[in-house]
Amino acid sequence: MNFNKLFALVLLIGLVLLTGQTEAGGLKKLGKKLEGVGKRVFKASEKALPVLTGYKAIGK
């Protein structure tokens, strides 16, 4: 019984590795979108942080 589970797991990992290489374009597009989101969040935080620190200074 354990051999069947191990064989199925190895087969599944092998299929994922083989099919993952053919879809590199899709993964690259996803990575670019995530990179763009990260840049937008970084720029927004650069704008918001001075405002927040000024607000905290007024509150003291």
UniProtKB/Swiss-Prot annotation:
Q: Where in the cell is it found?
A: Secreted
The induction text for this entry reads: By bacterial infection.
Enumerate the InterPro entries for this protein: Cecropin, Cecropin_insect
Q: Which domain of life is it from?
A: Eukaryota
Q: Where is the signal peptide?
A: 1-24
Q: Which Pfam families match?
A: Cecropin
The protein's UniProt keywords, in alphabetical order, are: Amidation, Antibiotic, Antimicrobial, Immunity, Innate immunity, Secreted, Signal
One GO location term (cellular component): extracellular space
Entry function: Cecropins have lytic and antibacterial activity against several Gram-positive and Gram-negative bacteria.
Descriptive protein name: Cecropin-B type 1
Could you tell me which species this protein originates from? Aedes albopictus
Q: Which gene encodes it?
A: CECB1
